[in-house]
Amino acid sequence: MPTSPRRNSIATTDNVIGRNKSRKRPHSLGGPGALQELKEHTNPAKGILKSYSSFSVDPAFTGDEDFNDIHTQINNTVIGISSNVMAASKRLQMEDLQQLSRETSRKSLNRRVSFASHARVRWYPKDHQSDSEKSTSNHSTPERTFASDAKNHSPKGPTTTSFSRNETQSSPHSHSASIISDGSDMDIASPIRSTESDMVSEALNAGHPPPSLYPENDDLSIQNPTKALPEAEKALDVHDATREQVNDREETNMDLTIQFQEADSFLSHSESIKGLSSSEQGTVYSLKASHDPSNQTQLSSPNKSSSPTSIEISDFSKNNENHDQSENKEEEEDMMLTRPIEIPQHFSPIARPLTSQEAIVDMDITSNNINLSPVSHFSNGLDLQNLEEAPMNLTRPINANPHLTNHSPNDLTNGEEEMDTTSAFNIENSHLTLLSPIRPSSRSMEEQIMDLTQPISSTNAPTHLNEDDLNQFTSNISSSSKPRKDNNKTANSSKPIPDSEDFMDITRPFNILSPSKEALSEEQPMELTSTVFPCENSTSHLEVEEAAMDETVAFQIRGNNVELPSADKENAEREEIPSYSDKSENFNTTSFTNHERSPNGNNNLKFSKDPNSSSPSRHVVATPTDKLGTRKRRLRYSTSSFDQSTLRRNRLATIRNARKSISTLNDRELLPVNFFEKKVNSGLYKSVERSENYRLGATPLTAEKPFTTEKPLSSLPEEVSRQPTDDKGEQVSNADVDSGLSKTERLTIQQTNEIKHVPTNTTSSVKLPQQPSNEDEKERITTADYADSTSLERLESQEPNRNELVQVGSSNAGNTTSVGMNEHEKSPVKLSKGVSNVDTSLGASTINTNILNQDSGPNEEIPVGNEPEFDTMPTLPNVEPISLSDFLKMTGIEFLDNLTIAKRRETLLPNAEENKKCSIQELLESFYIQFPLLELYKFSCQQLQDYIAEGKDFVTKIEEETLKENPLLFYEYRKASSDMRVLMDSQFLMMKTFARLQAKGDWYEWREGLMQGIKHELNLNLTGMQRSLTHLMDVANVIHPYAQEIQERYNGSITTVQTLKKQKEFANQYDSTLLAQAQEKLEKLKVEVERRRRLLSEKEERRKELAIKIEQVTNSCSDLELRTNAEQDFYAKNQDFEFDEIKRYEEQLLNLKNELGWTIVSLTAGGIKLATNNTALSPYSAEVTVEILRQNFQVNVDIACKFPNESNACSSNVLEHVASSFSKWHSKVFSRNLRLLKKYLNDVSICWEQIVYLVQDFQRLWYHWPFLSVENDDKSIIINVELYLRSVSSKVKVVFGLPIDTIYQTTEVGKFYASTSVAVKQMYAESEGDSYVSEVLNTLSEVVHCTSTYALSSACLTVWNKYS
């Protein structure tokens, strides 16, 4: 099988981001958990939807430093991986991650986090700094370090804090540019400011400011907040005992996947929150505080001062981003949210400084930094222990300009850009009235990891607001000329919250400053795309990313209606809103700010007291449906009487419900609108707290009484600064407001189990106007110009009778202002249909909201009491369903069943004998080799066709089901933004790659089985052919001797047949009559030719005879001539001898020849040479010569044999053997005695005669039996004769042995036959038996031993004739 689908998925991710990076992720697509869970899901969209619900990609990253995080965020998007799989992997990785986080502690990670059902976390680094700003930040911002004691919560050494002005303040352009890439719904990675000291709280409780902090007349520039608050350090010791007691009572359900710092954990003790050094923070602060009658804190610019009390805030955010760009290489890890959050009974926002080691909080959110910013000054007159930190926007700091209200409209439009929902507030020409009392941290650039699975505890005892403080706070609000920008909630109620355990909502953002456990237990489900999480710089940046709303356009509230902005009205209102580039054309989020400038520059808010509310934190409105859902949820999640096993089961149920919330995409989500402020005094920061976060599928809270204002929000701040209003819209005094708030405080404790909210520090609530004040404001409610198709579809999909709830937050590095708009119960609230985007006049923040009302008109009142109760599970908007094929075309997924390819071209050269007819051999070979394969292929093709048919039927059924009921993935993909679609397409591409590789693996496995079958058949064929080859070789060995002759006969017959066929064809071409006449003439000619041929042959014979005769005569003439010449020579030589003398010598020689029997051949001085006269061996010529030497009578016998050309080879061989033996046997040396010589010559002559008879006998044998063989050795001559006995059908071999001694010594004829040995051997016979062999042997022996001449041939003939 090819490469794991995992490498293809990584390569796909690299293609998306434009880089090549081979880095493996532990939970990438293709892991064992993902594969198993993917197989279990029958719905194709199930599991995919979980991954795409809240993830987004930063499309504006440009630096190399962003690559790791972008690659991680895409590659770690897991489809359907369960929590236990991630937990197992987490345990193996987090130990190294903790060490890495400590080693890289000097890194400021401004990242944005988003949650999905499986609790994944994403980092979104920001890199939008110019070179000049980077250099300014790096050189002009020194570090600040704080030393603290972890045990006593008191600083050990001096703190070096440098507050200086930023040389170049950030403009709205820098804010918007820095946050273009931030599109997620949660942000928890940036610094959170902690409070300065408990001394401030004690001073405020006492009713007067600390003398060391607030001089009456002079401006104070605090360079070291730690020295400025010496007494505040001691106040922290009081809360140690309380903290330890609370921790003993709490059940800390820790996630064991990572080490947790129990003693000084960030989540366990809110006072452990620390700020970072100035090199890490985006803002450097210079504070000037003075006491004025209105107890008001103002933000002032170093160059422009509009009031004696000012706080200067210089933006070094781009410097911080420069540092992030170089440092931001941390890898993302999984977050396991399988444990509930333990909410403490008591909470105090006053933090203490910690050491560097204590500030490292090992929590299970993928190594994010919780960076804290310093607080430089506090004011008196407010109980800071009841102030709780707001959710903070950790993405950008605040650039404040206190002279915004004094500028002309033309000056404000120069720096206008689009709103950025993820950016911090850019506050100009306004004064912050509430400051967040957060203490700076002693850590510098240290990474903190927050674990949402840990309980939150606090050691500070609750401190409640009294009526004097509330009256003073209300008085300050009425006299303030600066806008309120913080959503603050009370930290604790008037009485302790019962200790109980809650199950956290993993899809819900976490409140950093430890809200009450019971309040968190009643939280509503959060919409995934509208989740708000604590943001940077301790600011509540409420980003509600709505999938069907426009994020880039803000809206305004006029009365109870929402109005879209226009360019001319925006310039007329002199608003400056930070730009925010829309990341997608589908995700449009409506947002607005809760401040608008009045023409005279005073921004005031009107608050209304609620007699039914006894707590300032009663800012969240609730509907009866919310009460019912809260009551059911409280009964479901309450753990006061449950055992530990029940708690675990409920935890798992919470995880499942959260995943359901993500998968179902509840579009009926409503967000609460909360406007609430804190009391502002000289040197005080405003603390921002998010009022409520909703999960998907939550039911909106209804208010007991509606908030009303007499004028729209455009003029709302001015009137609020003049006088707060009562429930009926009439102005009331500060005393009335204070009395109303005290009642609210008491009522909050009683209703804390019914209304689900996060407690914040508020003193009054803002009433929304029920009717717009003028027609111009009504006209601005229209949505025709700004609501896009996605927003309208989303608005139409919402259920009717839902109250508009908007949550507003603003962030600043070190001081925050939150203003909330509340809706009380049991009163109708007017909603405007189709509202998508409305701008506000003050560029303070961009708030995401949902305005969901389909049935009601633009200004139609919807009674709360008539609201229907909604189910816990949401319903999808009414959109036109699409088919599966259309969705697959949208995602680029295609099936391969309709592909057609051309036939493979022929790559071999054409054969010259293409039309040659196949022989039988070729046909048989093809049959035995290919036929089994063809059968197997036929079967395989049928199986494949069946599989394909089944697959098509299955796909058809799926198409019918999906068309009948579209999966949620179809809707989400069509409504997704371009960036989300890129991410989803990358996931689809990985799924396609995985499916393709898996299908290829299945195909190879199936094909392997097919090939095994083919191999088996081929092996069987090979075995059979090998057996046949062996048999054929055996047969060929037998037939081979006769094959050649048969082949020659066959070829001759073929030639004859062909010739006859040609003749027949030739004869058929002519007429038969003419042919007959021609044949007659031909016969006559043949006869004549034959006659003449005979005559010619006769003449030729005659000629030859005459030629022979002529030749003989010629030879005779030649001989005569030679003889004549010889005679003449002889005569010439012997002419001296007399004739008589010569005649006498001739007579003597003749007499000697007659006596000896030898002819004298020659006479020499040395001896004489004699030759025998026997010529009986005709046609052989064997002449025996004897040379007698004269000296010692040495006789050398030599036989000169001459054989004719046609002689028998066997006889010649016998004669040669006999002659050689005879010469050796008779060559002797005699003494000088002629008698002995004469006798010896006689014996030689007789012996030679015997040998002549023997040779003639050999010739007779050869004539009858040609296969005669003769062998000779030193003692005998062996003759082998093969006889075929026809009567007995057998063949015998007769062996004669003639002894040489007897042959050469016998002088009698035939005597040597008596000593001849005879043997008979049977060669083959039809029947077994030795009877005839013995008979043959006896017959041969008798004939040989009794015959004198020709005994051998006579004996063989006798036997042959006998058995013939």
UniProtKB/Swiss-Prot annotation:
Q: Where is the composition biased (Low complexity)?
A: 170-181, 300-310
- This protein's UniProt keywords: Cell cycle, Cell division, Centromere, Chromosome, Coiled coil, Kinetochore, Meiosis, Mitosis, Nucleus, Phosphoprotein
Main function: Acts as a component of the outer kinetochore KNL1 complex that serves as a docking point for spindle assembly checkpoint components and mediates microtubule-kinetochore interactions. Kinetochores, consisting of a centromere-associated inner segment and a microtubule-contacting outer segment, play a crucial role in chromosome segregation by mediating the physical connection between centromeric DNA and spindle microtubules.
Highest taxon in the source lineage: Eukaryota
GO molecular function list: kinetochore adaptor activity; microtubule plus-end binding; signaling adaptor activity
Segments carrying motif MELT: 254-257, 450-453, 504-507
Assembly notes: Component of the KNL1/SPC105 complex composed of at least spc7 and sos7. Part of the outer kinetochore KMN network that includes the KNL1, MIS12 and NDC80 complexes. Interacts (via C-terminus) with sos7 (via C-terminus); the interaction is direct. Interacts (when phosphorylated on MELT motifs) with bub1 and bub3; to recruit the BUB1-BUB3 complex to the kinetochore.
Coiled-coil segments on the chain, per record: 1075-1155
State whether keyword Cell cycle applies. yes
Kindly list the positions at which Phosphothreonine occurs in this protein.
257, 453, 507
Write down the species: Schizosaccharomyces pombe (strain 972 / ATCC 24843)
Q: Name one GO cellular component term.
A: Knl1/Spc105 complex
What is the taxonomic lineage of the source species? Eukaryota, Fungi, Dikarya, Ascomycota, Taphrinomycotina
List where the motif Nuclear localization signal lies: 1091-1105
Q: What is the protein name for this chain? A: Outer kinetochore KNL1 complex subunit spc7
